[in-house]
């Protein structure tokens, strides 16, 4: 077992030469400059407040709440009501505002309540009132200028489902301004 440890093995890593952050020391003044303003004395040598200092009549420590004065369970500081039901959101906000001393204390709770509660009753009513309309797609048509692909034989029976065949786009004449003639430079294969 190793019994002798040099403190250098710990401190050496933090020396300026090893950290490579050595720089010349800042120049210091021989006499410290006087600060502007003054320090107001509010207590005597024994630590008691002087009579001229205003003091709270309720408590000399202000509104500080000690550990024993706090409630057994402290509510959360940040609350989101978004995923909660209306009754759960009401119970939670009542619990937060139940102890006003905790809310008013200088070291007390500053709750942040955000979001809107979820009402399942209104959601079911909306679902019942909404009716779904299904629109029947028209039968697919075959464009005469399109190339013939296996399965596009007009003799074969066609399915009435829109995804079964070719869904046509807008039809334009072959030599219209929107559809110029093919370029002779491009080879089509």
From Swiss-Prot:
Cited Pfam families: CFAP126
Top-level taxonomic group: Eukaryota
Any single Gene Ontology cellular-component annotation: cilium
Tissue: Expressed in mono- and multiciliated tissues during planar cell polarity acquisition.
Composition skew (Pro residues), residue ranges: 178-189
Compartments, record wording: Cytoplasm, Cytoskeleton, Cilium basal body; Cytoplasm, Cytoskeleton, Cilium axoneme; Cytoplasm, Cytoskeleton, Flagellum axoneme; Apical cell membrane
Region named Disordered: 112-189
Biased composition (Polar residues): 137-148
Keywords, sorted A to Z: Cell membrane, Cell projection, Cilium, Cilium biogenesis/degradation, Cytoplasm, Cytoskeleton, Flagellum, Membrane
Family that this chain belongs to: Belongs to the Flattop family.
Complex and partners: Microtubule inner protein component of sperm flagellar doublet microtubules. Interacts with DLG3.
Role noted for this protein: Microtubule inner protein (MIP) part of the dynein-decorated doublet microtubules (DMTs) in cilia axoneme. Acts as a regulator of cilium basal body docking and positioning in mono- and multiciliated cells. Regulates basal body docking and cilia formation in multiciliated lung cells. Regulates kinocilium positioning and stereocilia bundle morphogenesis in the inner ear.
Protein name: Protein Flattop
């Amino acid at each position: 077992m190793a019994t002798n440890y040099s403190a250098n093995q710990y401190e050496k890593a933090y020396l300026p030469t090893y950290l490579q952050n050595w720089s010349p020391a800042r120049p210091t003044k021989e006499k410290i400059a006087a600060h502007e303003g003054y320090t107001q004395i509010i207590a005597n040598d024994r630590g008691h407040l002087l009579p001229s200092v205003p003091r709270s009549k309720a408590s000399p420590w202000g509104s500080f709440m000690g550990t024993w004065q706090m409630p057994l369970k402290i509510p959360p500081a940040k609350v989101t009501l978004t995923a909660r039901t209306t009754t759960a959101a009401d119970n939670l906000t009542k619990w937060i505002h139940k102890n006003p001393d905790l809310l008013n204390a200088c070291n007390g709770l500053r709750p942040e309540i955000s979001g809107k509660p979820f009402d399942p009753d209104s959601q079911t009513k909306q679902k019942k009132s909404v009716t779904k309309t299904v629109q029947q797609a028209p039968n697919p048509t075959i464009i005469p200028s399109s190339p013939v692909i296996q399965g596009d034989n007009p003799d074969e029976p066609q399915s009435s489902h829109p995804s079964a065949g070719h869904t046509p786009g807008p039809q334009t004449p072959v030599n219209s301004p929107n559809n110029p003639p093919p370029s002779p430079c491009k080879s089509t294969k």
